Amino acid sequence: MDKGLKVGSWGQLQGKIRPAERFFAILTTPACIEWKVEKDDPADTHRHLSHLIGLYPGYAITNFDPSPSVQGTGSAKAYNKGQIIDAATVSLIHRGNGTGPDADSGWEKAWRAAAWAQLGNGSTFYHELSFALRENFCDNLFSLYNPYDPNPIFQIDANFGFPAAVLVRAKCPKFCYEDT
């Protein structure tokens, strides 16, 4: 830690740091905001879904509670659960289906599959996992970053992500969230 920051307890630390901005904001598109400014591009099919970590592997999006006792009070815009789920869905659609120029890896397809499972979309979940198996897994079931490369790179992430996505789907046969 910074030598100038002296705290004796978690409460003291919380009192010294600037309150964090709300963890979530919705763009005019409407999609989840990834940056502090509106720079979302619906054509950006980049493989990372860091702005959707609250959807998967987290649960802050599907279990969103808009009550002031949870979200706090202040000048930030308040959202309801339906708006949050819709924005996460739009963001996931904007990031593509794993066929974009930056989508060679199996792990991102497994992550997308798990995110679709969280949203209760079984057909897209199945498409993503089937596509990952077809495009990124060898006969020995090792995941390769780019199987068409003459010297392909083994990448374990998809091997862990695939069963994790299946477990999410098994846990969420219809919907992982209840619209209240």
Q: What kind of feature is each model-predicted range?
A:
Residues 1-179:
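Active-site core of glycosidic bond-cleaving carbohydrate-active enzymes
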